[in-house]
C-alpha cells in the first residue's frame, strides 16, 4: 500500500527566488482553503534555481534552502509532505540496497552506494522522492531503480511506507508501490484526449498508480484556463493528482488570476507559447479547482478502499469499462471514459468549448452524481456541461462513502462519514481503513467494514470484515443517506442494520 498522503493533491514547483517565496506559496494553500498534501521541489539544472546545487547533486541551494531542516520542519508544521526531484546520469543499475558497496564500481550503478547519497538529505525530513531521467536504462536497471526507492527509505524508517514518483519503469514496478507519470507532454487538447486511454491501458499493464502533469508540461498557444480546468478535473480522478509544468505559477490553483505565469522556461521547445494577457486574470479557475480538490478529499474513503482492492487483487483503480462489462461490445470499444473503482463512471471533457458530452452508460441503472437524476443503462446519453462540470455517474446498487472536506489527508475531524445508497440493485462495499503510514496493516492492524445493500428490503447491513479489527481514531460514525432520507449510526464492530 502507498501512504495515504500520496492520494492527496500534490503541487510541484520550478524556479524559486528565495526561501520566503517557497514558504509563501505553501501558506497560500492553507489561507485559501485549497486542500493539498504534498509540495514537490524540482532540482537545479532542470530549472535555474531548484532545491539543490545542480543535476544529480545532494547539496542544497542556499538561496532557497539555507537551513533545510528548519524549512522542512516549518512545512511539516503546516501539514505538508516534502518530495525532492532527483536525476540519475548512469545508464545502468544492478543489485539491491543491502549489497556491499563496491568502491571500484560507479556509485550510481549500485543501489547500495547510490542510496547512501540520499540518506543525509532523507534524515532531514524529506518524505518522498521524484526520480527523473533514466530513459536510457534497460528494463532490469529501471526495475532496480524502482526497487531502490522502495527498499532504501525503509533502511532508515523501517515502519514508514515510502513514496516515489518515477519517470519510467516496467511491468512489475507496482510491487514497489511505484507511482508513474506520463512525462513531459505538450499542453494541447489532443494530448489531454489521448491521456484517457493511456491511463486505462497503463492500469491494464499492472501499473495502477499513474498520473500526469496537470495542464501539460510544455505550454502552447492552446494552454488556456479552459484546458487547465478540464485537465484538472480529469486528474482529480487519477491515482496521482499532481500539477507540474513550465510557466509553473499557472499550475497553482489560484495562478490564473494573478497576472504572473512565473518564469517561462520554454525556449528549448518547438511550438511552445505562453498564454496571452487576457488569460491571466480569470477569477473562475480557483473556485472550480477548489470544487474538485474538495471532492477528491471527500472521496478518499472510496479511493483508499479501491487502493486496498488493487493491492490485494491487482485490479487497477482506473478501469476500462470492459473489465466489468466484458460482454458489452460498446463498453469494450470505449476508451474515452472509465470506471473509478467499480461504481463511479468518469467521462472527462476533452473538447475545447464543449457544451455537451456524449456518455455511454453500460447496462443497469446509473445516477448522475451532480443532479441525482437516474438513467437506464445500455444507451448513449448527451450530458450538458458547463466549465465546472465533468460528467460523473454512480452505478445503481452502489454504496458510496464520502468523508468530510479536509485540508490534508491526516486532518482530524469529528464529522461523520456519509454513506450514500444508490438504489435499484443490490450492492456491496468494503470500507478499508488503516493508519495510512505504516506497515502494521500487514499484521492485521486494519479496519474493514463490509456493507451490503438489499434493494428489495431497503436494508443496509454492516459487519466487521474477517481478519480486521476495530481501530481507535478511525471513522465509525456514519450518516446513511437514501435519497432525501437520512439516518445516523455508530458502528461498534458488531453487526448492524439500517432499514429505510
Language-model features, listed with the residues they occupy:
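Catalytic-domain carbohydrate-binding cleft regions of carbohydrate-active enzymes
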Residues: 1-389, 394-395
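Accessory, solvent-exposed terminal regions and/or long lumenal/extracellular loops of proteins
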Residues: 389-500
Amino acid at each position: 500500500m502507498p501512504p495515504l498522503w500520496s492520494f492527496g493533491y500534490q503541487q510541484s514547483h520550478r524556479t524559486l527566488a528565495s526561501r520566503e517565496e517557497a514558504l509563501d506559496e505553501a501558506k497560500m494553500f492553507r489561507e485559501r482553503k485549497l486542500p493539498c498534501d504534498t509540495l514537490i521541489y524540482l532540482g537545479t539544472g532542470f530549472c535555474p534555481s531548484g532545491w539543490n546545487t545542480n543535476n544529480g547533486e545532494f547539496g542544497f541551494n542556499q538561496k532557497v534552502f539555507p537551513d533545510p531542516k528548519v524549512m522542512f520542519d516549518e512545512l511539516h508544521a503546516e501539514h505538508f509532505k516534502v518530495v525532492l526531484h532527483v536525476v540519475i546520469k548512469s545508464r545502468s543499475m544492478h543489485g539491491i540496497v543491502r549489497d556491499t558497496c563496491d568502491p571500484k564500481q560507479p556509485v550510481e550503478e549500485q543501489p547500495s552506494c547510490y542510496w547512501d547519497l540520499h540518506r543525509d538529505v532523507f534524515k532531514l525530513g524529506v518524505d518522498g522522492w521524484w526520480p527523473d531521467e533514466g530513459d536510457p536504462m534497460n528494463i532490469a536497471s529501471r526495475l532496480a531503480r524502482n526497487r531502490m526507492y522502495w527498499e532504501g527509505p525503509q533502511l532508515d524508517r523501517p515502519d514508514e511506507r515510502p513514496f516515489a514518483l518515477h519517470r519510467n519503469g516496467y511491468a512489475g514496478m507496482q510491487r514497489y508501490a511505484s507511482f508513474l507519470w506520463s512525462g513531459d507532454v505538450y499542453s494541447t487538447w489532443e494530448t489531454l484526449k489521448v491521456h484517457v486511454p493511456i491511463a486505462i491501458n497503463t492500469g491494464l499493464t499492472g501499473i495502477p498508480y499513474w498520473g500526469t502533469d496537470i495542464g501539460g508540461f510544455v505550454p502552447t498557444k492552446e494552454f488556456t484556463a479552459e484546458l487547465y480546468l478540464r485537465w484538472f478535473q480529469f486528474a482529480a480522478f487519477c491515482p496521482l493528482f499532481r500539477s507540474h509544468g513550465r510557466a509553473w505559477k499557472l499550475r497553482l490553483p489560484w495562478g490564473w488570476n494573478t497576472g504572473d505565469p512565473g518564469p517561462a522556461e520554454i525556449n528549448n521547445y518547438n511550438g511552445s507559447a505562453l498564454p496571452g494577457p487576457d488569460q491571466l486574470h480569470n477569477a473562475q479557475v480557483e473556485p472550480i479547482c477548489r470544487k474538485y480538490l474538495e471532492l477528491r478529499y471527500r472521496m478518499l474513503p472510496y479511493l483508499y478502499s479501491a487502493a486496498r482492492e488493487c493491492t490485494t487483487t491487482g485490479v487497477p483503480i482506473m478501469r476500462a469499462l470492459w473489465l466489468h462489462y466484458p460482454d458489452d461490445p460498446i463498453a469494450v470499444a470505449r476508451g474515452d471514459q472509465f470506471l473509478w473503482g467499480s461504481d463511479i463512471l468518469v467521462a472527462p471533457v476533452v473538447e475545447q468549448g464543449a457544451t455537451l458530452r456524449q456518455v455511454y452508460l453500460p447496462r443497469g441503472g446509473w445516477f448522475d452524481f451532480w443532479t441525482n437524476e437516474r438513467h437506464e443503462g445500455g444507451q448513449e446519453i448527451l450530458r450538458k456541461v458547463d466549465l465546472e462540470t465533468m460528467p460523473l455517474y454512480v452505478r445503481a446498487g452502489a454504496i458510496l462513502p464520502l468523508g468530510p472536506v479536509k485540508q490534508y489527508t491526516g486532518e482530524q475531524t469529528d464529522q461523520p462519514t456519509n454513506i450514500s445508497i444508490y438504489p435499484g440493485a443490490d450492492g456491496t462495499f468494503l470500507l478499508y481503513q488503516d493508519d495510512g503510514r505504516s506497515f502494521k496493516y500487514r499484521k492485521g492492524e486494519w479496519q474493514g467494514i463490509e456493507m451490503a445493500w438489499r434493494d428489495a428490503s431497503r436494508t443496509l447491513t454492516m459487519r466487521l470484515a474477517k481478519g480486521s479489527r476495530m481501530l481507535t481514531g478511525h471513522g465509525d460514525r456514519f450518516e446513511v443517506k437514501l435519497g432525501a432520507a437520512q439516518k445516523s449510526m455508530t458502528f461498534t464492530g458488531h453487526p448492524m442494520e439500517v432499514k429505510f
